[in-house]
């Protein structure tokens, strides 16, 4: 099977001797208007892939920063339809691979078949749906694959080898390795078990391995003898934007590491 768009983005970064950079930005944050400016700024500043968060009223896996951003976006009227329309209008000038990350309910309300059609038309390359179990994702995975899109798998410290191999049998794009159990959020360091989780993921998956949850600065990766193929950062970026910073300056610190 040939590499997907998302896998190719990460492999291109590896060929350049660096991990791929994957910022996460909640759709409609800090404001609906500024969101699109910051999305394009991330793209221009060198993001290889951008995860666009779909706001939801009950974000059980999100820490306070992402949850607050989601609530603000909902109060501003942001919907999955709004996201689709905005991405479609900009797809010709966005270089980064686009991933929609959100909880199952908004996608179900939209309708899987209509969602996949509209996502493909908007230039989306993949989806992450944390609360869609592997045992129930076959229909959506097939619909996405038929349009050249990936359904990204998430694994963590408590994912056993058997379960990892089940994910690996159907996974495409990249595998999202959660650094720590619990919710998203900025942390000072990485748990000691991260190296083991990354090593187990590398043994099971042939696609690139991306590390997320609690990643805020390049220095956190220095203690890893085998760093991930891609790095995902969200809460630190959202906090930076909320404090008046801009996406380009945040990306610069990562691009120059």
Swiss-Prot record:
GO molecular function: tryptophan synthase activity
Keyword ATP-binding: no
Pfam families, sorted: Trp_syntA
Catalysed reaction equations from the record: (1S,2R)-1-C-(indol-3-yl)glycerol 3-phosphate + L-serine = D-glyceraldehyde 3-phosphate + L-tryptophan + H2O
Keywords: Amino-acid biosynthesis, Aromatic amino acid biosynthesis, Lyase, Tryptophan biosynthesis
Metabolic or biological pathway, per its Swiss-Prot or TrEMBL entry: Amino-acid biosynthesis; L-tryptophan biosynthesis; L-tryptophan from chorismate: step 5/5
Active site positions: 51 (proton acceptor), 62 (proton acceptor)
Chain segments annotated as transmembrane: none
InterPro entries hit by this protein: Aldolase_TIM, RibuloseP-bd_barrel, Trp_synthase_alpha_AS, Trp_synthase_suA
Keyword set includes Amino-acid biosynthesis: yes
Enzyme Commission designation: 4.2.1.20
One GO CC annotation: cytosol
Subunit and partners: Tetramer of two alpha and two beta chains.
Functional summary from the UniProt entry: The alpha subunit is responsible for the aldol cleavage of indoleglycerol phosphate to indole and glyceraldehyde 3-phosphate.
Similarity remark: Belongs to the TrpA family.
Protein name in UniProt: Tryptophan synthase alpha chain
Organism whose genome encodes this protein: Nitratidesulfovibrio vulgaris (strain DP4) (Desulfovibrio vulgaris)
């Amino acid at each position: 099977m040939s590499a997907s768009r998302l896998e190719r983005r990460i492999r291109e970064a590896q060929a350049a001797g660096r991990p791929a950079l994957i910022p996460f930005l909640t759709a409609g944050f800090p404001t609906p208007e500024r969101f699109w400016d910051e999305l394009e700024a991330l793209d221009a500043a060198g993001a290889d892939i951008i995860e666009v968060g779909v706001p939801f009223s009950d974000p059980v896996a999100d820490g306070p920063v992402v949850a607050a951003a989601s609530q603000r976006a909902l109060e501003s009227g942001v919907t999955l339809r709004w996201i689709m329309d905005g991405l479609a209008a900009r797809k010709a000038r966005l270089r980064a691979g686009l991933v929609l990350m959100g909880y199952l309910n908004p996608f179900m309300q939209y309708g899987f078949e209509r969602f996949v059609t509209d996502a493909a038309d908007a230039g989306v390359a993949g989806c992450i749906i944390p609360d869609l179990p592997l045992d129930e994702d076959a229909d959506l995975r097939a619909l996405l694959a038929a349009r050249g899109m990936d359904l990204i798998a998430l694994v963590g410290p408590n994912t056993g080898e058997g379960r990892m191999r089940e994910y690996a049998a159907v996974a495409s794009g990249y595998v999202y390795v959660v650094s720590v159990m619990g919710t998203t959020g900025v942390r000072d360091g990485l748990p000691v078990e991260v190296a083991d989780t990354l090593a187990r993921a590398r043994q099971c998956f042939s696609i690139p391995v991306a590390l997320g949850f609690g990643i805020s600065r390049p220095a956190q990766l220095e203690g890893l003898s085998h760093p991930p193929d891609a790095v995902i950062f969200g809460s630190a970026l959202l906090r930076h934007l909320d404090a008046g910073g801009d996406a380009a300056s945040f990306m610069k610190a990562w691009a120059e590491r």
